[in-house]
Amino acid sequence: MDKLKDKVIWVTGASSGIGKELAYQLSKRNCKLILSARRKEVLEKVKNQCSNPKDVKILPLDIIEFEKADSYVEIAIDLFGKVDIQINNAGVSQRSLIAETDFSVYKTIMDIDYLGTVALSKAILPHFMLNNAGHYVVVSSLMGKFSSPYRSGYCGAKHALHGFFDAMRMEHEKHGVRVTMVCPGFVNTNIAKSALTGDGTLQESNDSATQNGLSTTNFCNKMITAIKKEKFEVYIGGKEVKGVFIKRFFPKLLHKLVLKSQVR
Ligand SMILES: NC(=O)c1ccc[n+]([C@@H]2O[C@H](COP(=O)([O-])OP(=O)(O)OC[C@H]3O[C@@H](n4cnc5c(N)ncnc54)[C@H](O)[C@@H]3O)[C@@H](O)[C@H]2O)c1
């Protein structure tokens, strides 16, 4: 039997890309889903394209409204009576050199990619502790394990997620809490299009590395396997995944290889 069947899974960033594909694949597995992102009408569309729309609820939210995190969690729990797995997937990327980036852009990226996830995760923690069970799945990035030019704020925020959630795992394993850090390489979504540039406007164009990345279908299939296995940390992508191991043992080599690859 599928271990995820009938689990209540809350996915943030479910309106597009990885989050949308997760909704489709998890619905096929008969999970009960709560889909969150900012735009209600887009979430409705994703819901209606799921295999089992009657088991899909939508909860529109802006992840940077930290003060509403407790009420979002209360609503999420009420929708099916509990939440088993929270998939923290909402995020925004960056394409700008440090010298050209307004400080406000760093704040926005940190708010969305780090603090928003911390707020929602912290708000649901009492529920997980009460149930003596709960699984945080956090969509970080290979950029949470090593860095690359044009993404300084994004790399900072994704690295920070590892710091927070590794501590979460240690503090709450005794309460049945699990943490899976998912680090994608290049996945073919619109992440580059919605990436912030130095003045905070969107890049509005795709880049070839992302477009040539894994399909969301292939990526989410692997991600779901990692969730089922309750992996601590997983790297999913093409040859760029090797960067994690090269950084660990040969940091100067990784530095040279990233500069040589000239991925913008
Ligand atoms: N695509 C890649 O190559 C890649 C690589 C590494 C990591 N990731 C990570 O995967 C996750 C999903 O990205 P994607 O590739 O599907 O891109 P995407 O742009 O298609 O999806 C991002 C999602 O986050 C949501 N979001 C953004 N800001 C939000 C906010 N303030 N409140 C609520 N929701 C918000 C968007 O609406 C969207 O649903 C992100 O965390 C991203 O950093 C993607």
Describe each PLM feature range.
Residues 29-46:
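Conserved glycine-rich Rossmann-like NAD(P)H-binding loop of the short-chain dehydrogenase/reductase
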Residues 121, 157:
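Active-site helix of classical SDR
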Residues 15-16:
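Conserved glycine-rich cofactor-binding loop
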Residues 141:
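Residue(s) in the substrate-gating loop at a strand-loop-helix junction
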Residues 60-71, 103:
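The beta1-alpha1 cofactor-binding region of Rossmann-like NAD(H)/NADP(H)-dependent oxidoreductases
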Residues 174-238:
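SDR active-site lid
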Residues 97-98, 102-108:
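Substrate-binding pocket helix/loop in short-chain dehydrogenase/reductase
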